[in-house]
Every structure is written in C-alpha cells, then in structure tokens.
C-alpha cells in the first residue's frame, strides 16, 4: 500500500509540473528603456521658455506621484556636466529631508539650481543665488516650494525660542499676523491645522512677491518675459505639488 501511495504522489507531482506555466526566465518581457545620459546644453537651455519649463516640472511631478521616474545614468550625467551647467529652473525650498526637488520633479544632474532654508523664505544670500541662476546662468524659471506640515511654520506659530532658530523664525511674524487677520484666528496652538496650512501658503506667496520687490535684476527679467516666478506646496503624504497663483 505504501508503494502505491508513493507512486501516486510522484505521478501527481509530475503532472503538476507539466501543467505549470513557463517560468519568468522564458516569458517575454518588454525591453527596459535605456537610462538617460544626456544633459542640458547652452543651446537647449536658451530655447526653453518659462512656460515650457513649468510644464516639464508639472509632468515630472506627476511621474513621481505615479511611480514612473525616469531612469538616468547619473555617472554619465555627472561627467557631462563637469565642464559647465545650464539648468532649466531654480528652486527655493525648505531644508526638510522629505522634499528633495530633483526627485519630486523627476529631474537629473544639471537640471536644477536648488537653494534651501528652513521655511523657504528669501534673504540677501538666497536672492544673490537666484540672481546668479537667472541673470548669469540663464535659468528661465524660479520655483518657490513650500510643503505641508512645515516644521519652521509650526515653530513660528508656537513661538519657539532656541539659539539662532529664534531669529530665523522671526521671518514669519508678518505672515502669521496676516493669516490671523484674514481668518480671524487668534490661536497660537502649533497643531492648529487651519493656521499652519494657511501660513504655509501665504509664506510661499509672500516669498514670491518679496523676490520681485527686493531684486530689480529678477523683476526686470520677469518684465521682459525671459523669466517667471511660480510657487507651489508639496504634499508630504501624496507627493503632489499644488501650484498657487501669485
């Protein structure tokens, strides 16, 4: 009896193998796209309009959200940009580790100038950097990029005091005052979502306006049509950038 059971089990196993689908090793698969090695050149940058770059960043962010990031040969791009750079956009963003501009906009080496400070506000140093990026290096678009649940804004709402952080958070006093005036919100609760989100958005708008007011170099480029300044807020949960009107 044991012999017959053993023969039956062997036959059953053999039948199962015969009916099993072909392994992945033999299945046909679509060829994987070659990684991008090319970088922006001076001629390519010069041909870009602010509107075209804006659309490219929107499309790149959507690829990021969809999990369809472009494959890139970063070693090749690093070598290709060693002698010069011709970025398409300059991003003024927050230092938050969860908001890397090159990744969330699906851009490669040499595509973006990036200046970062907690709370993505402008100061003399960052204005000078943006003037270099635009007037000297030819970048046609400036992006002011905030993000949800910004720790700097939360700290300002809570009135945090800590070393040099205290002076930095003072940059948001006018933003918070305007938000509370508009929304008639008197709370100082750092977890008050309405205050925090409104302040994040207002801070982006104010930074955009301050860049134009404080830099004649940049404002003249905007007036001539060679440059645009846009702003958006990145959602930490979804990865999507919501663009704002100035």
Set out the residue ranges of the language-model regions.
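Divalent-metal-activated hydrolytic enzyme cores
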Residues: 20-84, 109-110, 119-137, 154-246
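Conserved functional hotspot residues or short segments at active or partner-binding sites
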Residues: 144
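Acidic/His- and Gly-rich active-site-bordering loop/insert found
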Residues: 101
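Bacterial N-terminal signal peptides that target proteins for export
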Residues: 1-8
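Short helix-loop-beta junction
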Residues: 104-114
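C-terminal motif of bacterial Sec signal peptides marking the signal peptidase cleavage site
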Residues: 15-18
């Amino acid at each position: 009896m044991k012999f017959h059971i053993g023969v039956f089990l062997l036959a059953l196993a053999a039948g199962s193998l015969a009916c099993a689908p072909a392994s992945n090793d033999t299945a046909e698969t679509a060829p994987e796209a070659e990684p991008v090695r090319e970088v922006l050149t001076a001629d390519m940058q010069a041909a870009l309009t602010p509107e075209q770059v804006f659309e490219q960043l929107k499309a790149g962010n959507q690829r990021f959200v969809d999990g369809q990031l472009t494959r890139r040969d970063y070693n090749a791009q690093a070598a290709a940009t060693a002698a010069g750079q011709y970025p398409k956009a300059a991003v003024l963003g927050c230092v938050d580790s969860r908001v890397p501009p090159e990744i969330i906009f699906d851009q490669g080496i040499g595509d973006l100038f990036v200046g970062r400070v907690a709370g993505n506000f402008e100061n003399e140093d960052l204005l000078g950097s943006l003037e270099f990026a635009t007037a000297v290096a030819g970048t046609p678009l400036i992006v002011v990029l905030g993000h949800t649940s910004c720790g700097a804004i939360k700290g300002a709402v809570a009135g945090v005091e800590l070393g040099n952080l205290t002076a930095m958070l003072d940059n948001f006093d006018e933003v918070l005052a305007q938000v509370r005036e508009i929304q008639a919100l008197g709370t100082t609760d750092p977890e008050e979502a309405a205050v925090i989100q409104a302040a994040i958005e207002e801070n982006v708008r104010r930074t955009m306006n301050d860049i134009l007011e404080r830099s004649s170099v940049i404002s003249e480029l905007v007036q001539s049509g060679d440059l645009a300044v846009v702003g958006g807020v990145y959602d930490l949960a979804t990865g999507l950038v919501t663009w704002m009107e100035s």
